[in-house]
């Protein structure tokens, strides 16, 4: 039997939600009621699969952790008042911390004037952000297209590369095994995880995947394309594979890929959605090798953890294919004033506080500690790796990684696995994480592993 729409029910639900938004604190009964509501609504109206996935971030496997508010720049508080050190960072969103006052203030000030653009008049903040990114990014990157997410920035990059290379008779893209570029149809064609790809096959034609970090395989793909007349339009890759398990390529890999692109007339697209904005110890990870892409994809931390925004930045030569018809690829909300205000404030904070350098220093402290723990618990931990504040602890199997996330939750530290590598736990805290909190995270990790070791010995 079809359910009839109910305006009264919708009005009551929205009014209840608005009442919650206005509240700063909840009493015990309100907390319990909200937990029950959220769990029920996820089950009935969002996706029940998320509940099973999030069992690792509950104390008793009862989905009890419902997010309520930021505690500080580096912590989250749930509805029960429990404060967690954030070592997940919203998968790389909170580089400048939670509710950074500079970013929040910029958005609030813009909100008081004009939240969204008219679509017809020229919007000043979009122009100013584009100019700022042209100054900030490496090489000849000059023009920016703004959108709302990482996968949208990748879609724009792929379309831009197609528009530039199709008249030159080049149609094929090279991506890499283990890659994650998003889940919209074009981005998914470059992504390399079968569990995400298979239900939507066939995907876009013209994508080849070669092993990440293997320059010989990359070179062979270029050569074969040349021999068969199926020439390469562009290479798309992450400087460090985030969802693949924080996989670092050999030193010099990006430099060699750049040389191949130049030799064969292909574009180099770097997806820095997760590695960008200071995360790895440089503003952009490609700067570790002084590599300059033709197209750069940004999102996640660009909005300062306050607003969603993505950007696709390209050289004038490439971007000029859109000059004659700027409406070839557009988006209603991309580059809106609130998002641009957040991005401009985020860049200001990153530079003023020199957060990329802090990420390098504090990342070294954390990684040294994790590697020491790996040496102490070789039966549990296979590897600890990373760059800056993008790190991973790889466990011996999926179940051990899941157990570590649960134990860290009990220690009030929030971590999670990666989408393409289940036995790898990602450590991706705000770049503002203090040295004291770094030490607390390492202490919690030691306690978690010690508890896991006891369980192993008791079996």
Swiss-Prot record:
PROSITE patterns: AA_TRANSFER_CLASS_3
Function, as annotated: Catalyzes the aminotransferase reaction from putrescine to 2-oxoglutarate, leading to glutamate and 4-aminobutanal, which spontaneously cyclizes to form 1-pyrroline. This is the first step in one of two pathways for putrescine degradation, where putrescine is converted into 4-aminobutanoate (gamma-aminobutyrate or GABA) via 4-aminobutanal. Also functions as a cadaverine transaminase in a a L-lysine degradation pathway to succinate that proceeds via cadaverine, glutarate and L-2-hydroxyglutarate.
CDD domains: OAT_like (cd00610)
Species the sequence originates in: Salmonella paratyphi C (strain RKS4594)
A molecular function (GO) term: diamine transaminase activity
Pathway terms, separated by semicolons: Amine and polyamine degradation; putrescine degradation; 4-aminobutanal from putrescine (transaminase route): step 1/1
Designated name of the protein: Putrescine aminotransferase
Taxonomic path: Bacteria, Pseudomonadati, Pseudomonadota, Gammaproteobacteria, Enterobacterales
Uppermost EC category: transferase
Gene of this entry: patA
